[in-house]
Curated annotation (Swiss-Prot):
SMART domains: GIYc, HhH1. Residues 218-253 form the UVR domain. It is found in: Cytoplasm. This is UvrABC system protein C. Residues 31-109 form the GIY-YIG domain. PANTHER family: UVRABC SYSTEM PROTEIN C, UVRC/OXIDOREDUCTASE. The keyword DNA damage applies. The UvrABC repair system catalyzes the recognition and processing of DNA lesions. UvrC both incises the 5' and 3' sides of the lesion. The N-terminal half is responsible for the 3' incision and the C-terminal half is responsible for the 5' incision. Interacts with UvrB in an incision complex. The keyword DNA damage applies. Disulfide bonds: none annotated. GO terms for molecular function: DNA binding; excinuclease ABC activity. Keywords: Cytoplasm, DNA damage, DNA excision, DNA repair, Excision nuclease, SOS response. It comes from Colwellia psychrerythraea (strain 34H / ATCC BAA-681) (Vibrio psychroerythus).
Amino acid sequence: MLHNTTDNVENNQTIKASTFDSEAFLRVVTEQAGVYRMYDSKQVVIYVGKAKQLKKRLASYFRKDVGSVKTQVLVKQIAAIEVTVTHTEGEALILENNYIKKYQPKYNILLRDDKSYPYLLITAHKHPKLGLHRGGKKVKGEYFGPFPTVGAVWESLRLMQKIFPIRQCEDSYYRARSRPCLQHQLGRCSAPCVDKISVDDYKEQVNLAKLFLQGKSSAVIEQLVARMELASNELHFELAAKYRDQIVTLRKVQQQQHVSGHVAELDVVGLYRDKTQVCIHLLFIRQHKILGSKSYFPTVPSESSDSEILQAFIAQHYLSNEMLSHGKVQSSIPKEIVIKESIEQVVELARLLSEQAEYDVKISTNTRSERAQYLKLAGTNAHTALVTRNSHKESMQARFVALNEVFELENGIQRIECFDISHTMGQQTVASNVVFNQEGPLKTDYRRYNVFGITPGDDYAAMAFALNKRYGKLKANPIKPEEHGALEKLPDIVFIDGGKGQLAKAEEFFSQLALTRTPLLVGVAKGESRKPGLETLILAGSHQLISLPATSPALHLVQHIRDESHRFAITGHRAKRQKVSKKSRLESIEGIGAKKRQSLLTFLGGLQEVMQADITALAKVPGISHVLAEKIHNALHDK
């Protein structure tokens, strides 16, 4: 049966059958350009491809002389094919990339690390804010980056504060100011919130900051020198001194920056592969120096060529069909991408990247001089990263094997989850759920739960809450939990950080699920001195106690998982506690309602300023009497 749907953008055609009839499909499939998705009998997308002529490309899969083993295996699993017609080949390339990201088909080259890079963002505000941004570019403003790490962004922000007095505070803090904050006193902000600088002068500093972030520090100095001379000629000596200080700081920065050569802005893509794995190492060259680097380990079908891998990486890493309606990105795509060999669609990819970046983007292969050296360095780093990863993986796999020797699970151990509870005197309770597989921590599957609706301090109830959050969906389909998706997959082992009571609560919970396969539940009890190496494992059911030698790889794995669970829980708890404490200090004072609390924060400029204020300053706040000011001061200083 042929199903057609048409809208203004694309045209979909689908044939579905228990046994795929390729002849019937090829008789009706279009010859236009587009993207095709192949499904198996479970309606799972197993491959996504694109073609200038869909009919011709799809017919090639069903010839008798298909040479590729991968293609032969793929064709045997096809139960349905869906095609999407596009207007151009470039549109097909973008759509293919997005479908691959969405469906993660097992026969495609997959770049699984889709974590967004951090950017510096200058917001589109009357008084723009300079700050770190990560995630979708939904905030209006100009984005500068990407940066390889968050640390690199913070380093840049600290540097920017020394040169340009642009605010870095949140808009809510900015709106609440009635007097300059500490950053203004330190010379790091011009206090636009309280009109210490005109809109035009602030805009001037913002524009200079943008030039600096574009790598044009010499142009910034030229403008500052001109303005310093103008201010001096007009006898505005204080303003001239400020420009002079900016120039001095900028010159120091220029001297400190190591210029590695004549290459200003490019990404260098290194590749190394062994028999089963591939590593791609990306070097970021910005403002004539190596800004940072990152390694990727894509999932690659065994017969894929280096050229195919590089093309898939460039498409998945750089291309996006999400046109930025709110923000303008500066340098998110470099002006040049260097790779070690040519790729089939180099012209089309370069055109699409140029269109997306709004400037010319070049993809270079035959490189010499500095670019060749960078490419060699990227390849060396890819090799090193793969060797390091394999060493870590071998160590982790050995620990999994050692742990299975302890528990003797028939099908081995593939996935382990661990739960921990963190709170302070029963308040701000947070539960963590960390996941490990044979490659180590699976951080994309980590979950943290804010626990509520229980008696404060009841760790057993908190554990039941967390288990229900994690596995509660399985109650709807206890027969086949694996059909709930990756995040609902049952682990082979569930570690419970705690003693017999916590373990009993977990046993009670899982007994209610009536699953066809229940994970092995194990309590991890700390020794009397709580020193590492003295942990005792408690098996569910028999509650048998197992103590492993301090040198045991199995124990090291348990400690690693337990420590990671504890770290993840306590990090969340501390953040929650800090957030609550900021509010609770004033809320706990009798006679201070919402209006007076807001008056204090707005008039004085925030909680820190309220705590630092003396009784006289507190009494100046509208609605706060001298008696109440004294009461507030005493409460905040525990008198």
